[in-house]
Amino acid sequence: DRRQRQMCIRDSIRTSGFDEMLDKQSMQIFYEDVLREVDVYNNDITLLQTRFVSPLSRIAPEFYKFYLTDTVYVDTTRCVELTFVPRNASTMGFTGRFYVPVGDSTMFIKRITMRVPHDINLNFIEGLSITQDYVKAPDGSRLKMVDDMTLEARLMPGTPGIYGRRHTVYDGHNFDPAPDPEIFSKGGDQIKAVGAEYRGQKF
């Protein structure tokens, strides 16, 4: 049903640093496999061919321990802070926190922050963290506004470390029927706008 399909248009893409160290093909693999977009609402999250149980999956209560740790403001919204850690430290899970507006009976998550524990072996990745922000649409559905992933890596022992970041901002959400339904026949859920790689830093 095309009315339920989603499409993201990438208006601006900017890279700095990595493109000076890796060739174009290696860069593509790096972004698709390491700095890939993560859907925290999936039961499993795959990073570097390693499957992690999402803290928001159906089996999360069996896999994670949850603690009510604080009440804080996220932007201007007063939220309850819930901390989660794997029940078994040796399993593939995240540590982190999510924030739910005080009094929200739907348990809508406004922000989630999570990281891969340092004692988990992820090949050359020494540290990886994810932060995502959401707002509630008028119909109650969730809209992702910010997706921020940072990592620390060391490609070979004894070499300098690498710091990488993928910061994505979403806006202009539009629920009107697509003016050209054929846009959904192109495959995938993202379209790169013409000239996206050449936008200025102030775009």
Predicted regions and their residues:
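Long, low-complexity, polar/charged, intrinsically disordered or flexibly structured peripheral segments
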Residues: R10-L48
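Low-complexity, polar-biased intrinsically disordered regions enriched in Pro/Ser/Thr/Gly
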Residues: R3, L155-P160, K186, I191-A193
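Edge strands and adjacent loops of beta-rich recognition modules
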Residues: D39-Y73
